[in-house]
Curated annotation (Swiss-Prot):
Keywords: Antioxidant, Copper, Cytoplasm, Disulfide bond, Metal-binding, Oxidoreductase, Zinc. It is found in: Cytoplasm. Its EC number is 1.15.1.1. Zn(2+) binds at residues 64, 72, 81, 84. This is Superoxide dismutase [Cu-Zn]. InterPro entries: SOD-like_Cu/Zn_dom_sf (IPR036423), SOD_Cu/Zn_/chaperone (IPR024134), SOD_Cu/Zn_BS (IPR018152), SOD_Cu_Zn_dom (IPR001424). It comes from Candida albicans. Binds 1 copper ion per subunit. Binds 1 zinc ion per subunit. GO terms for cellular component: cytosol; mitochondrial intermembrane space; nucleus; superoxide dismutase complex. The gene is SOD1. Its cofactor is Cu cation; Zn(2+).
């Protein structure tokens, strides 16, 4: 079992933690999160980005992690970036809390997400179907108010 965590924060009030667990390279990765400070009753884009560089804030994290050269899509789509985790849903207090499993996200192997950045976006991910200029690359999810580098944990 490999476990990882990202402490998410930024220039806004958005903050929290994201945990990852994977039993083996062929097993799905379980992702769980608790993030506060978002707008209430909202959907917020949630993506793993290429770099673990936050020297210039969350913009230094680069584009979505996309080792297979695909277009942006929904988590359940065949055509998607590895880093496309879709949206997280906030409650009436602006807290997003949940768990999901994903077969493309790896903690083990050459396409590992370790050392990369998880980003909470300011807008809703349109899953590449919104018709905006950036829909097929970013899901038109907007600014990056909070992020954290994914690192090993016990």
């Amino acid at each position: 079992m490999v476990k990882a965590v990202a402490v998410v924060r930024g220039d806004s009030k958005v903050q929290g933690t994201v945990h990852f667990e994977q039993e083996s390279e062929s097993a799905p990765t379980t992702i769980s999160w608790e993030i506060e400070g978002n707008d209430p009753n909202a959907l917020r884009g949630f993506h793993i980005h290429q770099f673990g560089d936050n020297t210039n804030g969350c913009t230094s994290a680069g584009p979505h992690f996309n080792p297979f050269g695909k277009q942006h899509g929904a988590p359940e789509d065949d055509e998607r970036h590895v880093g496309d985790l879709g949206n997280i849903s906030t409650d009436g207090n602006g807290v997003a809390k949940g768990t999901k499993q994903d077969l493309l996200i790896k903690l083990i192997g050459k396409d590992s997400i370790l050392g990369r950045t998880i980003v909470v976006h300011a807008g809703t991910d349109d899953y590449g179907k919104g018709g905006f200029e950036d829909s097929k690359t970013t899901g038109h999810a907007g600014a990056r108010p909070a992020c954290g580098v994914i690192g090993l944990t016990q």
